[in-house]
């Protein structure tokens, strides 16, 4: 029975990391599309848009990194 709980912990960590990666990929895709749309509408604002784009992209990308850290913690420290 102990082996089943270990398998469930590994599965939970894998699902957590996978869903975080999928969510970040979708978010960055939408963000990139909106950046290109804004740059096409007002080309003179590209430097401002680029700065905001990279700041928000870093924040969106931080969520999967936190999930990977928590997943590895669950896999190696808790289990």
Curated annotation (Swiss-Prot):
InterPro entries (alphabetical): ATP_synth_csu_bac/chlpt, ATP_synth_F0_csu, ATP_synth_F0_csu_DDCD_BS, ATP_synth_F0_csu_sf, ATPase_proteolipid_c-like_dom, F/V-ATP_Csub_sf
Keyword Nuclease: no
Cellular localization per UniProt: Cell inner membrane
Annotated keywords: ATP synthesis, Cell inner membrane, Cell membrane, CF(0), Hydrogen ion transport, Ion transport, Lipid-binding, Membrane, Transmembrane, Transmembrane helix, Transport
Pfam families reported for this sequence: ATP-synt_C
TM annotation in the entry: 11-31, 53-73
GO CC term (a single one): plasma membrane
Marked site: Reversibly protonated during proton transport: 61
PROSITE patterns for this protein: ATPASE_C
Membrane protein topology class: Multi-pass membrane protein
One MF annotation (Gene Ontology) recorded for this entry: lipid binding
Described purpose of this protein according to its UniProt entry: F(1)F(0) ATP synthase produces ATP from ADP in the presence of a proton or sodium gradient. F-type ATPases consist of two structural domains, F(1) containing the extramembraneous catalytic core and F(0) containing the membrane proton channel, linked together by a central stalk and a peripheral stalk. During catalysis, ATP synthesis in the catalytic domain of F(1) is coupled via a rotary mechanism of the central stalk subunits to proton translocation.
NCBIfam families documented for this protein: ATP_synt_c, PRK06876.1
Family indicated by similarity: Belongs to the ATPase C chain family.
Subunit structure as annotated in this protein's UniProt entry: F-type ATPases have 2 components, F(1) - the catalytic core - and F(0) - the membrane proton channel. F(1) has five subunits: alpha(3), beta(3), gamma(1), delta(1), epsilon(1). F(0) has three main subunits: a(1), b(2) and c(10-14). The alpha and beta chains form an alternating ring which encloses part of the gamma chain. F(1) is attached to F(0) by a central stalk formed by the gamma and epsilon chains, while a peripheral stalk is formed by the delta and b chains.
Designated name of the protein: ATP synthase subunit c
Organism: Proteus mirabilis (strain HI4320)
Gene name tied to this protein: atpE
């Amino acid at each position: 029975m102990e082996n089943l709980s270990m398998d469930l912990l590994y599965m939970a960590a894998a699902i957590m990391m996978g869903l975080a990666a999928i969510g970040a990929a979708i978010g960055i895709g939408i963000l990139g599309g909106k950046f290109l749309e804004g740059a096409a509408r007002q080309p003179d604002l590209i430097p401002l848009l680029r700065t905001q784009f990279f700041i928000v992209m870093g924040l969106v990308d931080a969520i999967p990194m936190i999930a990977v850290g928590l997943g590895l913690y669950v896999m190696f420290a808790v289990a």
